[in-house]
């Protein structure tokens, strides 16, 4: 919004003011001090210090850039100018008639700013000397007046301060004061500022100067007199409320915001409303309330800077009110009230005293010309005061309305496309649709808005175009995102489909996919980028190209990984049979056979990889790395297979088989049938020792050919090159000493069991039944056999039994018949027990019979109640007989 007024430089170094003026006599100073001591103190902070009473204390030594927080060294002896005691130091320094001699003639006035907004500061210092204020230091005040043209502002100032501003000729109402005039009040250290009136017919709608002059008065004066007629109170334009609103708004942003950010003290100004032609019908209190309400409403409507969001009107302005009767019709009353109002500017003891310490701007008098010039330059350069005329206001209002209507129609037309874009679709006609809807909105605006102020129309059209482009930007970005995703997927599909062909070149597939995707991107974005926009697609294009290359690298890595996995499967399959066969035939060349198979498989896999990797467009370094990884993987697979074949279970089985081949079979492979004459002990010891000798052979990978060992070391690499793959030295020890001892101990137990079994076989062969025993059985049983065969009844029964047994066996009815027989036996036993119990107890059978439940298969299930009965034993032992068979008894066939 603008610089803080405190930052406006006065001068690099102001010439020291001449204090060659004769000091007042000591008796005069003492008299003035005695007179001033009877005046009530000003409303200042209780902590402020009191300055020395000598006028020399006001002599400035150097002018520095204006800032309320900068110390003006030498301005006051030993005092900080930010201290209010400089301004309210003593009655001598703040009394209007003490610093300069009394003027008996009217002072010359100075046109500070002319009607063309030109600042005249060349004669300022000369006028200060003529007015006797060049040595005033801080002992001066500034008062300005604001009001409508021809309302008696200059007359009021002349009567209050004894100035000689031009007044209007009452015979013709026309502009009198042009620009801003400055004059010293007679016998007072007051600079009075007469400001050109507002709402004059000479300037018409051009309100630029009146806003700038009002802001200048508000920013520089301690007291701003707002001159108005009584019948203007409550009006917005007539009471200058519109002007005050603009001035207050710019004053906040231009002058006060910088102070708030810097932490400086807030400057306050007194707004003294002088109500002219007051007749008393409406009490002053009511008029005062109306004005206060209007000002509070204006303050609430201002857009405040961030640092002053919570600021109140009272933080920057105090309000004062005074009334004056009609100057012509009530001349005596007017003169009397002028004297009363005059005392408020003179009498420090008056409770309504105007020039209080907190209103002073803390600018020394010798730096005032530069300060005022800097403030005016800042106001002139500020664009916030260049407000439009009525025609421009109308054009702004109507153009805004038309632009809003066009924007709504545009948004409604574009909303239908949003859903499809959000769904991830690429709209081929989006560029044409956006251009068409934007052109329609601009045409709608041009049709109605082109009739208004052309400058406003052009500016608003540009604003509308910017707004429409901003509304289209999300569609543009969403289309780019969808296009990015679609082209990435398309390129991925092209590459993946190409890799499914029997013979393909991965590099050509990648180049083809990327070229096709980038061509489609360029074609679509050429239709998508609209004229009169600053849209660029360079970043999105570079991002898409990077992602496609990343995708190609990822797909190539996937293909390489799949190739490696397939080759590892082939290695596992190719290593399984040779290694297992070599380890199943333990001899001195066992590890030679294993490592030879390992080298053969490694060479085959490396050749297969190089052949198939040629189509993947891999680099030589990548091929070397992949082959090394495959070789390490093959070493891990070999170790895995070796450990599998030398596990405790497998190795124990293999040792047992090796032992049995030598113990249970002869040299020709014929199973041995042990005879008492065989030397079992010698055969056992030889077989056992030969088998135990295999354990150290399995325990360590130790080929007879040193070249095989060296080749494995070169393939596997050093231990630090791979943390996952063990080195040859780490992996060559297959079985630990403890594991070897455990396996040997287990084998010995199994061998001992085989030895004992063989020994038992020889003993059992010696203890067989003699053959002659069978002859004895035939001789002794001959008579019984003949008796059965010769007796028709026995023979018939024998035949029936044999026939029944044959049928049962033939029909596989043995189990059901046995189950039926068992069930009948249980039933008969239960029936017998029941009959016997009935006989012994003398109770009817129905009372003691257990409930029976028949199952579909014909078996009986007993569920008996626990009925106590007498013991059946004759020994008299007390038994609690209870039928506890609560579960069904099913046939044995179940």
Swiss-Prot record:
GO terms for biological process: endoplasmic reticulum membrane fusion. It is an enzyme of class 3 (hydrolase). Residues 790-792 are lumenal. GO terms for cellular component: endoplasmic reticulum membrane. Residues 1-64, 841-894 are annotated as: Disordered. GTP binds at residues 147-154. Its EC number is 3.6.5.-. Pfam families: RHD3_GTPase (PF05879), Sey1_3HB (PF20428). Residues 40-53 have a biased composition (Polar residues). The chain crosses the membrane at residues 769-789, 793-813. It comes from the Eukaryota. It is a multi-pass membrane protein. The keyword Coiled coil applies. Cooperates with the reticulon proteins and tubule-shaping DP1 family proteins to generate and maintain the structure of the tubular endoplasmic reticulum network. Has GTPase activity, which is required for its function in ER organization. This is Protein SEY1. It comes from Malassezia globosa (strain ATCC MYA-4612 / CBS 7966) (Dandruff-associated fungus). The lineage of its organism: Eukaryota, Fungi, Dikarya, Basidiomycota, Ustilaginomycotina. The gene is SEY1.
